Amino acid sequence: MVQCSNNLLGILNFFTFLLSIPILSAGIWLGKNAATECERFLDKPMVVLGIFLMFVSIAGLVGACCRVSCLLWLYLFAMFLLILLGFCFTIFAFAVTNRGAGEVISDRGYKEYHVADYSNWLQKRVNNAKNWERIRSCLMYSDVCSTYRTRYASINVEDFYKSNLNALQSGCCKPSNDCNFTYVNPTTWTKTPGPYKNEDCNVWDNKPGTLCYDCEACKAGLLDNIKNSWKKVAKVNIVFLIFLIIVYSVGCCAFRNNRKRSW
């Protein structure tokens, strides 16, 4: 049992070390070669994660295989913090994604979205001008609206209104249903005389670099995407936490065995 727990911990940490190499390499590569704010946004978290996994796995590997109790203690402490952070993140993710859903529009195949329907924490993220400028840049360089424009370019207005658009397409690539603009094609609409009850109608522009990227509906569409993504991540994180707890338990056995051998 003594040898088994140490060997198992060594094997698990060897694979974790191998995993850290491509994560760290990808983060460094993104930092040097990123073409957009979207890509640059990911480089630092990936570098930090890669370095953390590398050092923790080395500590666990050496501590288990060479029976160095102080390294195993540091490893277990880091693992405990990781489990605690993962647990807190999972609770937080479920808490901030428990609100928000698209509004069903009569005679429309798509929904429309409103920032006020989502949690206050998420609202603050998109209402921050600096944050939104970076996100807006990401959306412009992505294929969200270009794919939407290509896919629906040849359909008439009746078929367009029946289209099942996703949250970003509905919020960022077309004007709000409240505007009652005249349809020309998916990204070209003729404005009707104001005033408008929805401020997004004033923001809309047919220019490909503008569209509705600064609309509240676009922010809400992004929040709906984040909400759905975070719920999926939180569910996966539960499985990951179970795995970490198992590894932590094996580490505790190895640490206890090392202490017994030293006595």
Curated annotation (Swiss-Prot):
It comes from Arabidopsis thaliana. One of its GO terms (biological process) is auxin-activated signaling pathway. Residues 1-7, 67-75, 256-263 are cytoplasmic. The keyword rRNA-binding does not apply. The keyword RNA-binding does not apply. The chain crosses the membrane at residues 8-28, 46-66, 76-96, 235-255. The lineage of its organism: Eukaryota, Viridiplantae, Streptophyta, Embryophyta, Tracheophyta. Belongs to the tetraspanin (TM4SF) family. It comes from the Eukaryota. Residues 29-45, 97-234 are extracellular. May be involved in the regulation of cell differentiation. Keywords: Glycoprotein, Membrane, Transmembrane, Transmembrane helix. Glycans are attached at residue 180. It is found in: Membrane. This is Tetraspanin-7. It is a multi-pass membrane protein. GO terms for cellular component: membrane; plasmodesma. InterPro entries: TET_plant, Tetraspanin/Peripherin, Tetraspanin_CS.
